Amino acid sequence: KYYISGAGDPRCKIMITMVKTSPDADPFRQQSQILVPIDTPGVEIVGPMHVFGHDDAPHGHMHIKFTNVRVPEENILWGEGRGFEISQVRLGPGRIHHCMRSIGSAEKALDLMIERGLSREAFGKKIIDLGKNMETISRAKIEIEAMRLMVLKAAKAMDVLGNKEARIWVSMIKAMVPEKVCNIIDQAMQVHGATGISQWSPLSGMYTSQRTLRFADGPDEVHHHVIARAEVKDYQESNLRTSRARDEIATGRTRGGV
């Protein structure tokens, strides 16, 4: 397994490990989550994975090798085959939290963009007045507020409808927010010039975090598939209901002699 976050931290003593235990079961019942002490024989931390060239030591995202690792059966959480179920309980709220923090990053990037635009001059003007920088600021603010409303709606759906029914809204914000925040940070770096990718600015670190988030807790493509599949299903069911209603009307007319 690789990109195991936090496994390099010396305080990490036990891992919650997702493994396939029931390959012949229904797809969502094949996985189990098992507690594995990090010092169990056969567990090898190969080393840190790099993210955009950084290893984030000592906490990091580790590459871990399992060779004939054995633990007691009672280490299975909730019972065999419930790993996916456990993950979904955590992932829904976790994705909302990711998006909330992402909006905070977008707000910070916008502040830095405005500060740079007002404090830096070129060609005798403040750079905020050059090119389309004012429009860039406007569009960033509009997108931030749109993202905020979407995240609030997803959180409301989670509170009122529960994890399962809110999953489409959660997928929508997870597919949308990190990508849009990446764009806002990218625009802020552009306003800063080369300083925006230097050690003098937090923007490059903010960008890599947001770009990485487009893989974490499900890549964009998975969430787009979930959204589109639900939308297609709704369309098909709606058309089926309409077709049935037409048939009932037609049948009623025939029986009534109309």
What are these regions (language model features)?
Residues K1-V46:
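A short core secondary-structure module
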Residues R11-K13, P58, G131, W169:
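Residue-level preference for beta-strand/loop junctions
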Residues I16-V19, V36-I38, F52-D56, G83-Q88, ...:
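Short, low-complexity, polar/charged sequence segments that are solvent-exposed and flexible
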Residues K13-M15, Q31-S32, P41, G60-T67, ...:
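Structural beta-strand/beta-sheet cores of well-ordered domains, especially the beta-sheet scaffolds
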Residues H63-N68, E74, G79-R82, Q88-V258:
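Alpha-helical interface subdomain recognition
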Residues D39-R70:
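Flexible, small-/acidic-enriched active-site or ligand-binding loops
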Residues G6-R11, D26, F52-P58, L91-R101:
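Short alpha-helix boundary/capping segments
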